[in-house]
Regions:
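An N-terminal, well-structured beta->alpha segment
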Residues: 1-42, 50-51
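A glycine- and small-aliphatic-rich helix-loop capping segment at beta-alpha/alpha-beta transitions
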Residues: 54-63, 81-84, 104, 108, ...
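Glycine/threonine-rich beta-strand-loop-alpha-helix active-site module
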Residues: 68, 72, 79-83, 128-182
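Glycine-rich oxoanion-binding loops at beta->alpha junctions
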Residues: 70-112, 154, 158-159
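A glycine/threonine-rich phosphate-anchoring loop and its flanking beta-alpha core
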Residues: 153-219
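Accessory alpha-helical/coil subdomains and C-terminal extensions
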Residues: 159, 177-180, 202-283, 287, ...
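Internal helix-turn-beta structural module
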Residues: 324-411
Length: 411
């Protein structure tokens, strides 16, 4: 392993994540804001605790009561006047349903002078859920969508049809109270109705689009689900004000600034990366082949969210697959490294945020008798990168603004 490049990568990751934490953005939005009636806080998503904590520090006892729903292991400590739930992700579980029911009961009976402060971040689609079908049916269709390689927009289009709170329905439940929504975006282009399936946003997707997804992936759905697929979601909401605070664009900008501090010339490739993870890794490696002898320190940056088609039974995530896929292409390059992370600190069903590879990675695996292509076929990037000390482990970061992949070329 190139320890110098790995240290630079770790430092860039640490500083960039700190730059996109939601705390200050939430406080800035709430500063000097006046409220007439009750203030009810609802925070949902992987960054929910962090956002709720910031709101509590800003508003204090002006918050009457609140609920946080976040992923297991993401609640750091109690927050006064706010009940914290941890629940399942990426597949909702009984705690998801229990916590969401508690939210529905809390916002019922509010009047037009009251405000629901709705703090939303990625992961909310699984965490904030009251299904119109059984929990088993919901888990089954979610697993089908994840396994077939459906992207997040397609997954959320289906989820909206099957939920009491998605696709603008939560905002309807809050009426006549006003909903002040602060959103941390984890979807490319920041489409409000797709972030966490848009609980407080008028829905732009249609039943026709949902049916197209069912047919595209040949999903196996029950007769009850088929009936729900024909019920439209709210197309207009008059009680919602929304602010977007944080996105993958800001994450890429933070990475760019940090690369510059280490003397690397940043090259922004895209903040809309959406392809197979293996293809992204191979693409970054191809850039390295072209520029590795330029004599310049270069950093190629790509933000977005890639896709993995699950064909094996291994352990890993899309960012780990990007790093491992790049390893073969940069084999033997002493001045090249690729790292890729999920900004929330979680990549797939693992404890890693992502992965790192450099010119030594492929050789180390070969010496251990491991074929990178077979590993990728089995979706087992985690265990391969563990052998090369290529796992990036940050723990829950408190933010969630997509992923970022970086190719470093030193001089």
């Amino acid at each position: 392993m190139n320890k110098e490049l790995r240290a630079v990568a770790d430092n860039i990751i640490d500083a960039a994540i700190k730059a996109v934490l939601p705390d200050e953005a939430v406080k800035k939005t709430l500063k000097d804001r006046k409220f007439d009636g009750k203030v009810i806080l609802v925070a949902v998503g992987k960054a929910a605790w962090q956002m709720a904590k910031a709101a509590s520090e800003c508003l204090g006892d002006r918050i009457n009561e609140g609920i946080v729903i976040t992923k297991y292991g993401h609640v750091k400590e109690p927050i006064e006047r706010i009940e914290c739930f941890e629940a399942g992700h990426p597949v909702p579980d009984e705690n998801s349903f229990k916590a969401t029911q508690a939210v529905i009961e809390m916002v019922s009976g509010l009047n037009k002078n009251d405000t629901v402060l709705f703090l939303l971040s990625g992961g909310g689609s699984a965490l904030f859920e009251k299904p119109k079908i059984t929990g088993e049916e919901l888990q089954d269709i979610t697993n089908q969508l994840l396994a077939c390689g459906a992207d997040i927009v397609e997954i959320n289009t289906i989820r909206k049809r099957l939920s009491e709170v998605k696709g603008g329905r939560f905002a309807k439940l809050c009426e006549p109270a006003h909903v002040l929504s602060i959103v941390l975006s984890d979807i490319l282009g920041d489409p409000l109705d797709m972030i966490a399936s848009g609980p407080a946003c008028a829905d732009t997707t249609t039943c026709e689009e949902a049916w197209h997804i069912v047919e595209k992936y040949n999903l196996n759905i029950s007769e009850d689900i088929k009936k729900l697929m024909d019920i439209e979601t709210p197309k207009k909401l008059d009680n919602v004000t929304t602010f977007i605070n944080g996105s993958v664009r800001e994450l890429c900008s933070a990475v760019s600034r940090e690369c510059s501090k280490y003397g690397y010339e940043p090259v922004m490739l895209t903040d809309q990366l959406c392809c197979q993870a293996k293809e992204a890794g191979s693409f970054l490696a191809s850039i390295a082949k072209t520029h590795c002898k330029s004599g310049k320190k270069l950093a190629y940056i790509a933000g977005g969210e890639t896709i993995v088609n699950i064909t094996g039974h291994g352990k890993g995530g899309r960012n780990q697959e990007i790093a491992l896929s790049a390893a073969e292409g940069i084999k033997g390059m002493s001045n090249a490294a690729v790292f890729s992370i999920g900004s929330d600190g979680t990549d797939g069903p693992t404890d890693a945020a992502g992965g790192y590879s450099d010119g030594d990675t492929a050789g180390v695996l070969k010496n251990k008798g491991i074929d990178i292509f077979e590993v990728l076929k089995n979706n087992d990037a985690y265990n391969a990168l563990k052998l090369t000390e290529g796992l990036i482990i940050t723990g829950p970061t408190g933010t969630n603004v997509n992923d970022v992949s970086v190719l470093l070329i030193s001089d």
